[in-house]
Amino acid sequence: MTLKQVIVVRDDLKLSRGKLAVQVAHAAIIGYLKSDSSLRRKWLDEGQKKVVLKVKSLEELLGIKHKAESLGLVTGLVQDAGLTEVPPGTITAVVIGPDEERKIDKVTGNLPLLK
């Protein structure tokens, strides 16, 4: 069983690279803290595989979150404090996992990579 964590970010917000990096870092930590301890240990041992993908809207992001939760996957939302680029409370990303790669791919397999 191969594990990974997927972070999906909103491309419509047009965040700066630095801001985007911080949102992805927040998401990775949220997913780690919410995951089962046995999965967390295995994921760490495997090298902490992460993939960052993008969606075009908040609605699409929330749909991905709902689909992941319906499959029993751990998720978490990142909401920005609003101190720099976006208003307070803006949802910028969702994290899925870490969990089994094949399970996460059922939710995110068709999403484009963030480049």
Swiss-Prot record:
Gene Ontology CC terms, in alphabetical order = cytosol
Enzyme nomenclature, EC number? 3.1.1.29
Compartment annotation? Cytoplasm
Q: Which UniProt keywords apply?
A: Cytoplasm, Hydrolase
State the InterPro entries in the record: Pep_tRNA_hydro_II_dom_sf, Pept_tRNA_hydro_arch, PTH2
Which domain of life does the protein's organism represent? Answer: Archaea
Q: Which reaction does it catalyse?
A: an N-acyl-L-alpha-aminoacyl-tRNA + H2O = an N-acyl-L-amino acid + a tRNA + H(+)
Q: Which GO terms describe its biological process?
A: translation
Q: Which GO terms describe its molecular function?
A: peptidyl-tRNA hydrolase activity
Q: Which Pfam families match?
A: PTH2
Whether Iron-sulfur counts among this entry's keywords is: no
Q: What does this protein do?
A: The natural substrate for this enzyme may be peptidyl-tRNAs which drop off the ribosome during protein synthesis.
UniProt lists the family membership as follows: Belongs to the PTH2 family.
Protein name according to UniProt? Peptidyl-tRNA hydrolase
Identify the coding gene: pth
